[in-house]
Amino acid sequence: MKKTTKMFVMAALLMAGSQIHAQEEHQYVDLGLPSGTLWATCNVGANSPEEAGDYFAWGETTPKEKYYWTTYKYSYNGAESAFTKYCTDGRYGDGRHGYNGFYDNLIVLQAGDDAATVTWGNEWCTPTKEQWDELKSNTTSSRTTQNGISGRLYTSKKNGSSIFLPLAGYRWDRWENKLEGVGYNAQYWSSTLNDKDSSMAWAYIITSAEWKVKSINRSSGVSVRPVRSAK
């Protein structure tokens, strides 16, 4: 991000009442959350809060052309129900077993499989399901636009600081290689696997009607908004 761009972004957010902090080249907001979690102002791959950034399958650390089971890193031979990592059930069963009886009971992304950590450094990670729940419980949410981009603004109930999540859409290319739902919905990964169905991982879903934590297909191309711990 260029210096002038950084100054513009910081000024805009400060005007909105947020206390912006810089950590090397990545900025974050203290929302006064009980856990002390600090939320980044931008998505991975973005240069401003309203920019979509990159899309990632769950547990993958680089964007790609096609998001489906046939291209998913941890799917055995393109199967949607046979996994080589992050699996809680080795028995045969739709969408919840490892290849050839494999299971590892890993339910949280390891650092080397976390797009936020690999891209931004060890102090950053993808939020857990619990951190998304905490954000939703401790902020108010409103539909808004920022520099012409639709999204939701999450404002702290404690200190009035806020973060903007753009409606960046998502990728899942079973039939066509295209981006879905830009300006209407968004999906943001958590680092937490659905331990009842290993084909799914938890994500924060934003639509015109709702915003909640929900499990989705882990081969989908989804946004990542990093978090870090307070120093």
Residues of each region from the PLM?
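Bacterial Sec-dependent N-terminal signal peptides
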Residues: 1-23
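Conserved positions within compact, well-structured domain cores
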Residues: 23-231
